Design a protein with these regions (language model features):
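Alpha/beta-hydrolase superfamily serine-hydrolase fold, recognizing
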Residues: 1-159
Length: 159
């Protein structure tokens, strides 16, 4: 379980990102912090869809649900190193207010000093998985290299 990677796509990326936070994430489940977080076209903020989800899915619940949290709001200085990517032509992220998605996550990671790699592709729409035949093709290899790099750095003795 040491230095494991947590991978999430789209809304699964949002759940993975929230799991990496202190408030409702891995500490509550008594598991180690992920060694790295790998995200493909993550939804950071469900934005205007939150009331719709509440109305359609959780009509009788007053408790907070996963969609009430933003990944960027869960980022603290001890958040795992994060690799994430998304496309400029991702119409789903545009529908959820584009600047509240990848750009907001990047700002939160930078503000908290969390190591990260962000790739923004011109032609990489939502739901393309490993992205064969798009500008994002090869992202999974890049993400694995980021994971290896972060794991190697974490295992070096402190100076």
């Amino acid at each position: 379980t040491e230095d494991y990677a947590l991978l999430g796509y789209s809304s699964g990326g949002q759940i993975a990102g929230v799991f990496c936070g202190q408030e409702v994430g891995y500490p509550r489940y008594n598991v180690p912090r992920p060694g790295v977080l790998l995200l493909a076209y993550p939804i950071n903020n469900f934005y205007e869809a939150k009331p719709i989800y509440r109305w359609l899915i959780d009509t009788y619940s007053e408790d907070l649900r996963y969609y009430d949290y933003n990944i960027s709001g869960c980022v603290t200085p001890d958040f795992p190193p994060t690799y994430f990517w998304y496309g400029l032509n991702d119409i789903l992220l545009m529908a959820f207010n584009y600047y509240e998605q990848g750009p907001a996550l990047q700002k939160a990671l930078a503000r908290n000093g969390v190591p990260y790699h962000e790739s923004v592709y011109k032609r990489a729409f939502h739901g393309i998985g490993i992205a064969g035949g798009t500008d994002a093709e090869g992202w999974l290899n890049d993400a694995a290299a980021f994971w290896e790099e972060q794991t190697a750095q974490a295992q070096q003795p402190a100076a």
